[in-house]
């Protein structure tokens, strides 16, 4: 809690200095889908800044990290929540930014919280990542941070996209598809505990699948 307060205060003071220096008094913050952690967290953070730094922060729902970096580079947003590995992809021009090239016009203000790669299912046959073979699995939108995290975890278990029935869905679409029985499992990358996953595990027989340490290091 103390760390969170320190981060928020540092961000608020930094933006206040911008305002005092004759800079912008209104900023747009890109977050993520409305069902995810970015949007909820961004809403609280934006309101705090608005109340304490004399800068109005307008929080908007977006497609996530890559879209936020692109919008900051284009000048449409001034702030954005971004997955740290996607930030590195942009800076280096790799993976999700390989086709369009590097973007290095942004700067990091603060690290907010750790995100967890989570694998959720309602299929009792799925007890490990290896059990995803032949299953219908949401691995995030193409080129997204979730997508590359999922590909890395699958690879560590000896699987590729071709070994599963890959579905390229957003956070909200993934949880809805699980509820409706349209997919067998989904990769979710978000701050833990994740409210949408908690709700799903509480109201259905959904559960988190263990991911071996060797799959994430």
Where is each model-derived feature located?
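Paired acidic/hydrophobic, glycine-rich loop segments that form the ligand-binding mouth/hinge
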Residues: 78-83, 184-189, 207-209
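A structural signal for short loop-to-beta-strand junctions that line the ligand-binding cleft
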Residues: 20, 98-112
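Conserved small/polar residues in nucleotide/adenosyl-binding loops
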Residues: 216
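Short, low-complexity disordered leader/linker segments with a strong preference
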Residues: 1-27
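Pocket-flanking alpha-helical
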Residues: 43-47, 60-99, 119-122, 172-177, ...
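Bilobed "Venus flytrap"/periplasmic-binding protein-like clamshell domains
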Residues: 25-51, 56, 114-180
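Extracytoplasmic
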Residues: 24, 54, 64-67, 74-77, ...
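Conserved phosphate-handling catalytic cores of large alpha/beta enzymes
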Residues: 213
């Amino acid at each position: 809690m103390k760390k969170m307060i320190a981060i928020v205060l540092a961000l608020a003071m930094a933006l206040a200095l911008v305002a005092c220096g004759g800079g912008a008094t209104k900023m747009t913050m890109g977050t993520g889908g409305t069902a995810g952690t970015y949007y909820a967290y961004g809403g609280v953070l934006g309101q705090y800044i608005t109340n304490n730094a004399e800068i109005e922060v307008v929080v908007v729902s977006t497609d996530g990290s890559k879209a936020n970096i692109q919008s900051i580079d284009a000048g449409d947003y001034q702030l954005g929540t971004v997955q740290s590995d996607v930030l590195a992809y942009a800076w280096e021009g790799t993976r999700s930014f390989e086709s369009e090239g590097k973007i290095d016009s942004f700067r990091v203000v603060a690290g907010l919280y750790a995100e967890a790669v989570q694998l959720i299912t309602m299929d009792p046959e799925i007890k490990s990542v290896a059990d995803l073979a032949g299953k219908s699995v949401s691995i995030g939108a193409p080129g997204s941070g979730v997508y590359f995290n999922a590909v890395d975890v699958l690879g560590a278990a000896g699987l590729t996209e071709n070994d599963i029935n890959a579905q390229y869905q957003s956070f909200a679409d993934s949880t809805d598809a699980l509820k409706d029985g349209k997919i067998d499992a989904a990769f979710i990358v978000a701050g833990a505990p994740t409210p949408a996953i908690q709700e799903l595990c509480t109201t259905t027989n959904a559960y988190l699948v263990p991911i071996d340490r060797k799959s994430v290091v």
